[in-house]
């Protein structure tokens, strides 16, 4: 490779990445998932597009795809709160194993019939497209304001279902290549090995990396690089010993993100940029890899297969996978079924048969690419609409306009929160001494216009003041009520109900106040405890229960305890207008 070729490579790469970033603004305007934009740029630059770039190097595409997935999952793990596991771990694992098996089987049967293939080849197509994609899920769910149970289930599922899909794909390829026509029980041991070694190396490697980071004194910019290199080492080691590298690097990030770690905010900021670059690079390469005119001959059967998977296979797999978990409302199950997003993973898995030289390998790749395109366009585009229709959106916690870490000590986790005081907030016109600040927080600075003030207890707050507060992440809910204006998501003021009651209120007192019948229910228990029992599992904000003709909504939590409950009356039925 001479200097001119290298320079042309840099030129083309920079132009494609720059174009992807610039046209990404069309995503919000057109309501199209941003991943489709990146994919489209690659296709336009490819063999059939205006760019005319011929790219058919499948090993390079496999390398780029795996590297990008590793970075995206590391970033996703760092941002996942381990508290979400209390409501979603077992449901997500059920979907990641049993759900993938059901989806693979149903999709495989349809694929074999639609494309006139052997049943094992049909199952291979089902396995290739059987898992949801972490890159697509993390990208499209971010900032949508979904309730915790739905978000956590989808994110944990997407981060943990790839081992099953990879295992099924590799096993079926080996069987087809060797001429086997039946399944053996040895695949169960292989599956346990994938999950077990992936989890062990992910958590073990994450712990070792955490100890190393907190004991090393490095330049600030080196900590993110150490996290990335350590995560990739865990990913590669897990793959090398027969475990799931994808699961390992996700769990490595999860452990790092939920423990005190040096330079946390520097790591998160850099990983955010790296994850975006990984998504752009991965979907550009996959867009270049496909030849659009090869998709037209299979368009009708591939579209039928995609719709079968979206409308039949995925809903049935979710319905079966969530049978043991009664805390899930039918609305939540329907939304989880709809958001079975396919992305880069199926396309990368579709490269496996090509590298193995299987007959019909190009057909498998084209079908997988078509299904991913339909999934992103249909499911990804309709995601906000489906969330509102199925009422899985909850009012977001008010947040500061910006926040920055204060690297005092790895275990202190102090942060600086910046608030813009909206004119509608009650604190406008109040003196600072009148504010009920959370314990352990301090006002560090007050800006009025471009002027830095020296605040005292008698300083009066005015509209459009900028307030800087030092505190911890757990102080955000209380600070938000004082200073923030929650973003408008089209949710009415009555989302939680006509009145909000304390979760500690005695149930008999609530029943007496609203004229409700207990019908043998223990009236001595707290309202919050009763609602939790009716939900049937770990509660999340936004959970609803119908009781005595009224709608009871979980409005606030304190740990696992329901702290506040909203009550909503049917239209035309007045309430007593009291708070307990």
Curated annotation (Swiss-Prot):
GO CC aspect terms: plasma membrane
GO molecular function, one term: flavin adenine dinucleotide binding
Subcellular location: Cell inner membrane
Transmembrane segments: 3-23, 34-54, 58-78, 95-115, 122-142, 163-183, 185-205, 218-238, 241-261, 270-290, 303-323, 335-355, 363-383
Ion transport in keyword set: yes
Top-level taxon in the UniProt lineage: Bacteria
GO BP term, example: cell volume homeostasis
Membrane topology designation: Multi-pass membrane protein
PROSITE patterns: RCK_C (PS51202)
Domain RCK C-terminal residue range list: 403-485
Family matches, as InterPro entries: Cation/H_exchanger_TM, FAD-bd_PCMH-like_sf, FAD-bd_PCMH_sub2, Na+/solute_symporter_sf, NhaP2, RCK_C, RCK_C_sf, Transptr-assoc_dom
Classification via Pfam families: CorC_HlyC, Na_H_Exchanger, TrkA_C
Family to which this protein belongs: Belongs to the monovalent cation:proton antiporter 1 (CPA1) transporter (TC 2.A.36) family. NhaP2 subfamily.
HAMAP family the UniProt entry points to: NhaP2
Protein's name in the database: K(+)/H(+) antiporter NhaP2
Natural source organism: Pseudomonas aeruginosa (strain UCBPP-PA14)
Gene that this polypeptide is encoded by: nhaP2
